[in-house]
């Protein structure tokens, strides 16, 4: 797998998780398989190769489609998704510069590993713990991401926890994207190459 392919895969992982955030914030319900795929990426902390992070490649198709939507030549850009993406990448930069936050993150993810001996990754207790990792470590690094949606839906504690857990999953992919050399300027100057790579992955 080339670096461009790996980087585009990680970027699809970010958008796949953020798309679920947007959907849950509006509708309240969620796709358990899609959520599990995103949550599982958090648990792969020492991959031998980038593709090891994404065990469920089918779920990444949503992310690749969002790449075409957001970076392609069409007029259908989603401003809300762009705002989430920009905010998340800004938080990731802060995370990458904080050894203390990275250390705490690693420790807390190890605790979830132990919990998975007894619970499924989409169990409400696990989701609550993933959400608290985001709240305790990521959220405090910079300006909080303002999630918009249905106010009645957003009041539900479980919805809030799912959103935070999915933001943690999006952060996992953002960390990988940067480790693979991803930079915000690529989204402008390497846009065509990213879109072409996403298209190829959708036709496989």
From Swiss-Prot:
Family annotation (SUPFAM superfamilies): YcfC-like
GO cellular component: a single term: cytoplasm
Keyword Cell inner membrane (UniProt): yes
Keywords on record: Cell inner membrane, Cell membrane, Cytoplasm, Membrane
Signal peptide: none
InterPro entries for the chain: HflD, HflD-like_sf
Keyword Cell membrane attributed: yes
Membrane topology listed for this record: Peripheral membrane protein
Superkingdom per UniProt: Bacteria
Major subcellular location class: cytoplasm
UniProt-annotated location(s): Cytoplasm; Cell inner membrane
PANTHER family: HIGH FREQUENCY LYSOGENIZATION PROTEIN HFLD (PTHR38100:SF1)
Annotated family: Belongs to the HflD family.
Listed name of the protein: High frequency lysogenization protein HflD homolog
Species of provenance: Shewanella amazonensis (strain ATCC BAA-1098 / SB2B)
């Amino acid at each position: 797998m080339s670096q461009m392919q790996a980087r585009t895969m990680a970027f699809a992982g970010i958008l796949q998780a953020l798309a679920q955030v947007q959907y849950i914030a509006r509708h309240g319900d969620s796709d358990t398989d899609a959520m599990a795929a995103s949550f599982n990426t958090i648990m792969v902390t020492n991959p031998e190769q980038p593709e090891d992070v994404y065990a469920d490649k089918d779920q990444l198709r949503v992310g690749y489609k969002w790449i075409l939507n957001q970076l392609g030549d069409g007029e259908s850009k989603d401003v809300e998704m762009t705002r989430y993406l920009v905010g998340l990448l800004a938080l990731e930069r802060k995370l990458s510069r904080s050894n203390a936050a990275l250390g705490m993150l690693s420790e807390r993810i190890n605790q979830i590993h132990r919990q998975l001996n007894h619970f499924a990754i989409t169990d409400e207790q696990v989701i609550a713990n993933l959400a608290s990792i985001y709240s305790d470590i990521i959220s405090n690094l910079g300006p909080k991401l303002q999630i918009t949606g249905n106010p009645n839906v957003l009041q539900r504690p479980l919805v809030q926890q799912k959103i935070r857990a999915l933001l943690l999953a999006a952060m996992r992919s953002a960390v990988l994207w940067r480790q693979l050399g991803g930079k915000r300027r690529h989204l402008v100057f390497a846009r065509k190459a990213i879109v072409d790579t996403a298209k190829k992955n959708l036709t496989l």
